[in-house]
Amino acid sequence: MLPVIDARDREAVHREAEALRRWHDGLTEPLKVAMVYGGGSQEDRLYLAHCPPEQRSDTTLRRSLTEIGADFTVLDPCDPGFVRSLPAFDIALPNLHGPYGEDGRLQGLLDYLRIPFCGSGVAASAVCADKLLCKRFMRSVGVPTPDWQVWWPGQKTEWPGRPVMAKPVLGGSSVGMSLVQDVAALVPALEYAWACDPSHVLVEEYVVGLPVTVGVLQLPSGLLVFPPLATEAIGAEFYDAEAKVDTNGRGAVSVTAADLPAAVRTDLIRHALALWNGLGCGGWARIDFVITGTGQPYALEVNTTPGMSAESNFAVGAGLAGLSHADVVRAILHEALTRRPYDVPLPTPALGAAAEVGETAA
């Protein structure tokens, strides 16, 4: 396991940022970065439809990549030439969410093509994107998570007698998710979730408390756990898709440093690190919790491709820890490029030919 850097030690954080700048300044040529971004999932299409360009994560990432002098190109995974374009780049920076973006499928493609990429690998991405698998893993390592049931289409449903969250098993940004507080709302909530993921629905006990999120960033000398953030939707029942994705309503969302007792903060960091290490996350991640009135944290989800707009939870947490947006970008590029290098050739002649095309284009 990697050492942990205390976010309260500003000198240590500053040293890490300086080490990243020296590493990047020592590169002989600008990095050729493929930022993978587009509307491949319902979540991303919703984001593109509702978020003004100036507030989107790709705009902020473009700004930071320009600041650090990277030679970057935005590649749309829906473009027919997407796969053939990839070998021309030194590294891929996925900026996608939901199925085909952060669920291990894109990561598997990049891994197969021997293209370094930012963020977690295939296994961690796949498990974290599947809420059911992730909750089972949480339980297996002793991290508290709300009780749940799994319901399939056509299954007889019974009101559990207490409020629950109905969630699609795959996908994020609360798309397809509903708070169900009475029996009349149960069937519409299930149908809404099934419309997003027709396989099965996670019906999770609704835990009343303070929503908190914790960012984790892999730096050259270890893991930095950001100060916990309290994330509350004002005037809404919960932090729903509209609050997360529709930035025109950002005034209805409160994101602040969480004022927590030392013992609760310690528990949060311990649980976040247990999930990071146990799942084998890499680069960066954001773990969402809810804290009850008695100070008990319950883990909800692990996000392996956090949103990176200027006002995103991850960027705000990094700022509280003393890092700029450009520092975070350097960190995830550094982590991806300093992993164990590939030492075997491309596995098929077809992929070898694709690599040659990329080399010629370069």
Language-model features: where?
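Short small-residue beta-strand/loop micro-motif enriched in glycine and branched aliphatics
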Residues: 119-120, 173-175, 251-253, 309-314
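ATP-binding N-terminal substructure of ATP-dependent carboxylate-amine bond-forming enzymes
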Residues: 1-118, 122-123, 127-129, 133, ...
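ATP-dependent carboxylate activation and anion-phosphoryl transfer catalytic cores
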Residues: 1-25, 261-362
